[in-house]
Amino acid sequence: MKLFKYKEPQHSTRHFAVCGILEIDGKILFVRHTYGAAKDKILIPGGYVKEKELPTKAVEREFYEETSVVCKARDIYSVQFKSEEWCIIFTLDYVSGEPKSDGYENSEVLLLTVDEALARDDITNMSREILRAYKLNKKGLPAGDYVAKSRTKDNYVIFGV
């Protein structure tokens, strides 16, 4: 007996996104968004995962593209699910670079403490909720060492094991 009928859409409208919490000298990196629902709001940087791109590489790429900062994905902090989009929220380690706006997707880069960010009216609701949780618990799911035999560390990662 078949319980569910599923027909694969010819063109998927589902998106996979990433964003991240990056601390530099005790302050969190934010950008001021220039378009869409978050226009003129501050949020933690992120963006969409490209075809065949690992989410860890996507968040590192997005941070570099948007802020000129090189960072390394450390842990999965949280995951947001919507019917049309999934977003993985990472914690990241700072590697190098001076934070600056890309002048396109964002108009400003800010470094704020968690309390400074939470006190602002211009922060997105999602970033606010992530920070509220982060203030209470900074621990996420770390990347494991296991790599499937048919894969390499460049195209495989498992978290929490």
Model-derived features: positions:
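Active-site-adjacent beta-strand/loop module that shapes the phosphate/pyrophosphate-binding cleft
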Residues: 80-100, 110-116, 130-138
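Nudix hydrolase/Nudix homology domain
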Residues: 107-161
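Conserved Nudix-box catalytic region and its N-terminal flanking loop in Nudix hydrolases
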Residues: 24-61, 65, 158-161
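A short coil-to-beta-strand element that immediately follows conserved catalytic motifs
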Residues: 69-78
